[in-house]
């Protein structure tokens, strides 16, 4: 018999029970396979590609992209949807760029939105930690990662090089809040920006700010890219944005959709309903005419939309049938 075989074998469960709290360990089959709840983004297209119907609760989401590609609009529309369900949202406005009028146009209830303006990245993470621990916040939006300046940068001279300070801040801060997120009912959105890598000749020359920590800790990463301008005659009235779930730990990743973001009022929800109604055959097309329940309701897309918007009862019927199909598809995924 080997010497090691003579050693007393201890019951691992009993040993853990004696030293640690029961909440720190469990048997694998005790884990409940619960469906992750989510907050709608206000866009059916985006909700669908997330695979969970929006921004996951108890998880970290990163929304990143180039300037004017719809990042802030998605975040604000998510705040509005959170409030519609009776939830409480907090915006950490590190950039100091919050537009009251635009938020109001997106149906954000300004009387219920809590806004904070932390001076440093450390202060921002302290606020996030405090808010999560209250157990009363449903959504936290951080705008933006690029503006989460480390305290060391405030104290340093302009000539001092502080390599990696931002990345270290993000790594430490996310490491602190991640364990809290696992037990919370709070969703967090970090808005981030793309930067050009210096001296990059091969591969993707773009990178997000703040190092690699957010990529690691985020359960969902959404990329936005401006695909085209939307024009009405010679006037530019909005942008068409390509939205991609670059990372998704809760559903299949790399799903893509295109959304219309109109200047001054965000997503065109009515258009999205019509898109899906046509896709699922709720609105049928024969030649140039569109039909609903065998009734002719519009010749061409523009007339179809005008007819639906003028008839609330008809639009409600189309919407309810369409959303039933969309939700049924999510259930069967």
From Swiss-Prot:
Q: Which PROSITE patterns match?
A: RECA_1, RECA_2, RECA_3
Could you state one GO biological process linked to this protein? DNA recombination
Q: Where in the cell is it found?
A: Cytoplasm
Q: Which CDD domains match?
A: RecA
GO molecular function annotation? ATP binding; ATP hydrolysis activity; ATP-dependent DNA damage sensor activity; damaged DNA binding; single-stranded DNA binding
Which GO cellular component does the record give, naming just one?
cytosol
Signal sequence region: none
Q: What is its main location?
A: cytoplasm
Please name every pair of cysteines joined by a disulfide bond in this record. none
Binding positions (ATP): 65-72
Keyword annotations of the record: ATP-binding, Cytoplasm, DNA damage, DNA recombination, DNA repair, DNA-binding, Nucleotide-binding, SOS response
The entry sums up its family as follows: Belongs to the RecA family.
Its biological purpose is as follows: Can catalyze the hydrolysis of ATP in the presence of single-stranded DNA, the ATP-dependent uptake of single-stranded DNA by duplex DNA, and the ATP-dependent hybridization of homologous single-stranded DNAs. It interacts with LexA causing its activation and leading to its autocatalytic cleavage.
Q: What is this protein called?
A: Protein RecA
| Classification lineage | Bacteria, Bacillati, Mycoplasmatota, Mycoplasmoidales, Mycoplasmoidaceae
